Design a protein with these regions (language model features):
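A cross-family phosphate/adenosyl-ligand binding-site feature
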Residues: 1-122, 128-329, 333-403
C-alpha cells in the first residue's frame, strides 16, 4: 500500500506539451489508492482533453470559475477545492504558471486554488532549455521553494524543440515516487523501526491437535498499519491468522508457537525503537508433544502442561531505549491486573481491554481500550473500530516518546 493511499490529491495541469503525460500520472495516483481531482488551465485543453482526465480520475475536471449546466451557472469554489486536498500537485508547471504562482497573478482557477490551498504543494517544472535556465525562471523556482512549495526537478533529455538539456518534466512514476518519499520523510516515525506481535499461538499436542485461543490478529494488524502510516518500518510477528497486510513498510514474519514468537521477537528487538506486543500468546504448552495422532480410546485424556516463555517480561528485562507496550485482556479485576503487569514486566505502557465490554476482544471489528502509561495515567477510549483504536494507541505512544 502506498503512503498516498486514501489521500486526496488535487492535480493542476498547465499548457505545456508534457501535459499529455498527465493521463499516466492520474492512473498511477489512482492505482496507488489516492483520490484525484483535476484542475486545468483553459489552454492546457489543447494538449489533453478533460474527457480523458475525468474518465481516468472518475471526477469532473475543473477549468473555469463558472460552468454552465443546462440553464444554470455553477461556481467552482476555489477555496473549497483547496481545502479538499491533502496535497496539491502542479504538473506540468510552465514558465508562465511559475511566474503567476510567484507573483500571485490570480487570473485562472488553478492559480486561485493554489493561493487558497492550505495543503503541501508540489510542482514539476516543464519547459524548453533556455526558458528553464533563464534568470526569471530561476528566480521563480527559488522563490516558490522559499514559500515552502516542493519542487520536483526537471530532468535532462530531448525537449519538444529538438534541443537536448534540462527542462523535461519528470516522468510520472518519478513524480509519484518523489511525493511518496517526501511525505514519508515528514512523518513522525520516519526512520524508526517498530516491532508488533499479533494473533494467537498454537501449541502442538500431536500432529493434528493444538492448544490455542480465539484471537484473530485483527488488532495487531491494524496497529501495524497505523505504525507504517506514520512512517515506521514495521516488523509484524504474526501467529496463525487469516488477516492480510499490503504495505511496503510492513515486513511480516509468520510463526506458529510461543517459542517461535519468542525467538522472532528477540531477533528484532535490538533494532527497534518501539515494541507493541498485542499477540495472545499461549501461557502453557504440552510438556511432551506426541509424534503420532492420539486415538480416542479412553474416557479421559491427561496432558501435562508447562509454562511458555514470557516474551513480554523477557523483553522488559533487556530493554534499553525501546518503548515497550503490552496488552492485558482481562475478565476480572481488570485494572488491578493490568497495573500489576505494567510494573512486573517493566513496561512503558499497557493497553487494557476487557472481554466484559460488548464489542471488544477477539474476532470482532471493534474494540474498547484504556491506555495506561508507566506513571499509571489512564486514557480511556470509547468503543471504536479496531483501525480507529490502532490510531488512538499510536497517538498515545507518540505523545510519550515525544515528551
Amino acid at each position: 500500500m502506498s503512503i498516498v493511499s486514501g489521500k486526496k490529491i488535487l492535480l493542476g495541469i498547465t499548457a505545456g506539451i508534457a501535459a499529455y503525460k498527465t493521463a499516466s500520472l492520474v492512473r498511477l495516483l489512482i492505482k496507488s489508492g489516492a483520490e484525484v481531482q483535476v484542475i486545468m488551465t483553459p489552454a492546457s485543453k489543447d494538449f489533453i482533453t478533460p474527457l480523458t482526465l475525468s474518465t481516468l480520475s472518475k471526477n469532473p475536471v475543473h477549468s473555469t470559475f463558472y460552468e454552465k449546466e443546462e440553464e444554470n451557472e455553477l461556481w467552482n469554489n476555489h477555496v473549497d477545492l483547496g481545502l479538499w486536498a491533502d496535497y496539491m500537485l502542479i504538473a506540468p508547471a510552465t514558465a508562465n504558471t511559475l511566474s503567476k504562482m510567484t507573483n500571485g497573478t490570480c487570473d485562472n482557477l488553478l492559480i486561485a486554488t493554489y493561493l487558497s490551498a492550505k495543503c503541501p504543494v508540489y510542482f514539476a517544472p516543464a519547459m524548453d532549455l533556455d526558458m528553464y535556465i533563464h534568470p526569471s525562471t530561476v528566480t521563480s523556482l527559488e522563490r516558490l521553494q522559499a514559500f515552502g512549495n516542493k519542487m520536483i526537478p526537471a530532468t535532462h533529455g530531448e525537449l519538444a524543440s529538438g534541443l537536448v538539456g534540462e527542462g523535461r518534466m519528470a516522468e510520472p512514476q518519478d513524480i509519484v515516487s518523489f511525493m511518496e518519499n517526501d511525505i514519508m520523510s515528514s512523518l513522525p516515525l520516519y526512520g524508526k523501526k517498530v516491532l508488533i506481535t499479533a494473533g494467537p499461538t498454537y501449541e502442538a499436542i500431536d500432529p493434528v491437535r493444538f492448544i490455542g485461543n480465539h484471537s484473530s490478529g485483527k488488532m495487531g494488524f491494524e496497529i501495524a498499519k497505523a505504525a507504517a502510516n506514520l512512517g515506521a518500518k514495521v516488523f509484524l510477528v504474526a501467529g496463525p491468522s487469516n488477516e492480510k497486510v499490503d504495505h511496503a513498510s510492513i515486513h511480516r514474519i509468520d510463526v506458529v508457537s510461543a517459542e517461535e514468537m519468542y525467538l522472532a521477537c528477540h531477533q528484532q528487538f535490538s533494532e527497534v525503537a518501539i515494541a507493541i506486543l498485542s499477540a495472545a500468546v499461549a501461557d502453557y504448552r504440552p510438556k511432551n508433544v506426541l509424534t503420532e495422532k492420539i486415538k480416542k480410546k479412553d474416557a479421559t485424556l491427561d496432558i501435562e502442561l508447562e509454562p511458555t516463555k514470557d516474551i513480554l517480561a523477557s523483553l522488559g528485562r533487556i530493554k534499553k531505549e525501546q518503548f515497550l507496550v503490552g496488552f492485558a485482556l482481562e475478565t476480572n479485576n481488570e485494572l488491578a491486573n493490568a497495573l500489576a503487569k505494567l510494573e512486573q514486566k517493566n513496561l512503558d505502557a499497557i493497553v487494557l481491554n476487557s472481554l466484559k465490554d460488548k464489542g471488544a476482544g477477539f474476532a470482532t471489528d471493534t474494540n474498547k481500550v484504556t491506555f495506561i502509561d508507566k506513571d499509571t495515567h489512564q486514557v480511556a477510549f470509547e468503543l471504536k473500530s479496531k483501525s480507529e483504536v490502532a490510531i488512538d494507541i499510536m497517538n498515545e505512544i507518540l505523545k510519550k516518546i515525544d515528551a
